[in-house]
Amino acid sequence: MTKKFLNIHLTIAKFGAAHGILGWIRVFSYTEKKENIFDYVPWFIKKEQKIIKILPKYWKILKKTFLVKINDVNNRSMAQKLTNYDILINQKTLPKLNNNEYYWKDIVDCTVFDTNFIKLGRVSELIRTPSNDILVVKASNIKNISQNDMLIPFLHPQIISEVNINNKKIVIKNWKQTFE
């Protein structure tokens, strides 16, 4: 993928298996509120280095799974061609956030420091839990810090004292973890 492509589009879901003979297909949403995926249209897929626009026409829920009817997809074999493709959106369709709210895409690749400005590592991913999100931080090559991933609760302001998305920097405090 080109850098430009990565900067414009964001993966928010994935197509699953075709359902029935009329062209319906399962969709697995990655959005926090699963049904919000339908607020972000049009959708796109990347196929053989080309971006293809996908327009959902109808959707319904069957056994906790979204079934979607796509414009111009009228039978099972057409729907099967979409199976396992990531569903992308243009990042400009995302709503503006309030202060101290962040999209995961903006947190990933941030450098994490402690309050003494010691670099602890870089955020590689986030994990959603019922109580709070968790930063997965790839440790830096610093004495007394292991090469294992650090799991840091994303609790602002209890543990996270600063998030600067523009500078890709997160500062943590009050964090007691043994890095052995």
From Swiss-Prot:
GO biological process, one term: rRNA processing
Sorted UniProt keywords: Chaperone, Cytoplasm, Ribosome biogenesis, rRNA processing
GO cellular component: cytoplasm; ribosome
Domain PRC barrel: 99-179
Molecular functions per Gene Ontology: ribosome binding
Location of this chain's protein in the cell: Cytoplasm
SUPFAM superfamilies attached to this UniProt entry: PRC-barrel domain, Translation proteins
Any one Pfam family match given in the protein's UniProt record, by short name: RimM
Broad class of where this protein is predominantly found: cytoplasm
Comment text on domains: The PRC barrel domain binds ribosomal protein uS19.
Biological function: An accessory protein needed during the final step in the assembly of 30S ribosomal subunit, possibly for assembly of the head region. Essential for efficient processing of 16S rRNA. May be needed both before and after RbfA during the maturation of 16S rRNA. It has affinity for free ribosomal 30S subunits but not for 70S ribosomes.
Similarity section: Belongs to the RimM family.
PANTHER family: RIBOSOME MATURATION FACTOR RIMM
HAMAP family: Ribosome_mat_RimM
Subunit structure: Binds ribosomal protein uS19.
Name assigned to this protein: Ribosome maturation factor RimM
